[in-house]
Amino acid sequence: MLDLLVRNVNLPDGRKGVDIAIKEGKIVQLAKGIEAAAVSEIDGQGYLVSPPFVDSHFHLDSALSLGQPRLNQSGTLLEGIALWGELKPQLTVESIKQRALAMCRWSISQGTLCIRSHVDICDDRLLAVEALLEVREEMKPYLDLQLVAFPQDGFLRYGRARENLLRALDKGVDVVGGIPHFERTMSEGAASIRELCEIAAARGLRVDMHCDESDDPQSRHIETLTYETQRLGLNGRVTGSHLTSMHSMDNYYVSKLLPLMCEAGIHAVAK
């Protein structure tokens, strides 16, 4: 017996009046006029059924925190990061969970069933990690939540970032994150990419780095990330997030960079 049978729906590929048979959480048949008993049956009334939305870059630990501890008067990224630093000492596992769960439920209601969320590990208590691991487990029946160990204050710049990141990965965080443009120098940014990619390669994990999140055309950490991806055989497992500086770069340089990114299978999240 099927668990669920959804009748008379339209699919994105143009098929109409299709039935969808579901058992043990998986679609087992797509066809018209499926003849099978089901625990539950829904009449789709000819509505469109599509794959769920995916939010590939989010920060659930800071979701719904507008005005805490105060408003961002300048509206800039740097003030936003500073405000998050002011809020961190006031955080509790429960407060993070409450906001994150509310955001997850809101996302589910809008058709988003997969979220990749960065979680700040530059808090020696790892409260956000603990909270979002609990959220991941609670939301598991409804939402695929992937967590990225994110050194918000800089992997080399923050003294215990390496230790905290490894602790977070040991607890079950899924992806290695980074923020090379927030290190003190370009060379330290490159060094952070190298070390973080080596950690990911050693553990068989994916990488998702905030990269070049500025208007500076000389911020070219995506090139280093692409190189390390190739060097360590991480092809297809690495994401560059933001990549804002690319719009300011010289066209000739970008014409060289883009093929290298494609060759390495770099995923880009321009958000």
Feature names for model-found ranges:
Residues M1-S50:
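Histidine-rich, glycine-flanked metal-binding segment
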Residues V9, G25, G46, H57, ...:
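Divalent metal-coordination and catalytic microenvironments
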Residues Y47-P69, S214-D215:
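Di-metal (Zn2+ and/or Mg2+/Mn2+) metal-binding site signature of metallo-dependent hydrolases
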Residues L64-I96, G172-V175, H221-T239, C262-H267:
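Active-site gating loops and adjacent loop-to-helix segments of metal-dependent hydrolytic enzymes
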Residues L66-H118, L126-E138, E163-D170:
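Alpha-helical scaffold segments that flank or form the walls of functional sites
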Residues Q90, S117-L243, H247-S248:
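Metal-coordinating catalytic core of metallo-dependent amide/deamination hydrolases
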Residues G240-K271:
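C-terminal active-site-proximal or functional interface alpha/beta core segments in diverse enzymes
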